């Protein structure tokens, strides 16, 4: 499992890290990323089965396209389209699951839809960090206990609700 964390002092990723670190039988490699080349290098070096990226995110609409942006730090936006080829290589080398714990991730999903990641999770809207972390904990707890990934996703999603709005749709 390769976990990449954006470096924003306003974003608390300690709980994400603790959740990932507590997984049984997982070779966890983590680092705070500051550039696109960091991500490319880590994908090429580590060939992960699972990719987890946490940070601020946004979706951008263009005339005929949509892109997702991850903010590696408050001043460094990274368009997912620039990483698409590297993510495809990672899929070809065994990447099975990608979780983007970033707000407004539909642009990320759009850019990576034809890369054929077996399981891609994005947050479709802006959600509180605590809710995203609750979802991650439930998902990984179920999955690490042997639940099928799709079912683990459904169970985690079902446990998360904010008033009457459902933040996570399958």
Features from the language model and the residues they span:
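Mid-sequence, gly/pro-rich, charge-dense loop/helix-turn segments that line enzyme active sites
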Residues: 65-78, 89, 145-146, 155, ...
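Short amphipathic alpha-helical segments, especially helix-boundary/capping motifs
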Residues: 58-61, 83-86, 112-117
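Caspase-like (clan CD) cysteine peptidase catalytic core
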Residues: 71-104
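A domain-level signal for caspase-like cysteine endopeptidase catalytic cores
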Residues: 1-77, 111
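Short hydrophobic/charged patches on amphipathic alpha-helices used for structural packing
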Residues: 39-41, 84, 88, 109
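Secondary-structure boundary motif
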Residues: 22-25, 45, 88-92, 145, ...
């Amino acid at each position: 499992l390769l976990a990449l964390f954006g470096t924003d002092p306003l974003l608390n990723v300690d709980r994400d890290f603790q959740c990932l670190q507590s997984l049984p039988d997982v070779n966890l490699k983590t680092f705070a990323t500051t550039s696109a080349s960091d991500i490319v290098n880590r994908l090429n070096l580590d060939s992960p089965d699972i990719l987890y990226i946490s940070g601020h995110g946004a979706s951008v609409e263009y005339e005929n396209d949509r892109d997702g942006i991850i903010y590696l730090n408050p001043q460094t936006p990274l368009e997912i389209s620039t990483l698409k080829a590297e993510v495809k290589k990672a899929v070809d080398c065994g990447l099975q699951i990608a979780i983007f714990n970033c707000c407004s991730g539909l642009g990320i999903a759009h850019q990576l839809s034809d890369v054929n990641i077996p399981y891609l999770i994005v947050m479709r809207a802006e959600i509180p960090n605590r809710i995203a972390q609750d979802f991650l904990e439930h998902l990984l707890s179920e999955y690490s206990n042997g639940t099928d990934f799709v079912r683990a996703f459904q169970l985690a999603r079902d446990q998360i609700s904010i008033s009457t709005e459902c933040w996570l749709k399958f």
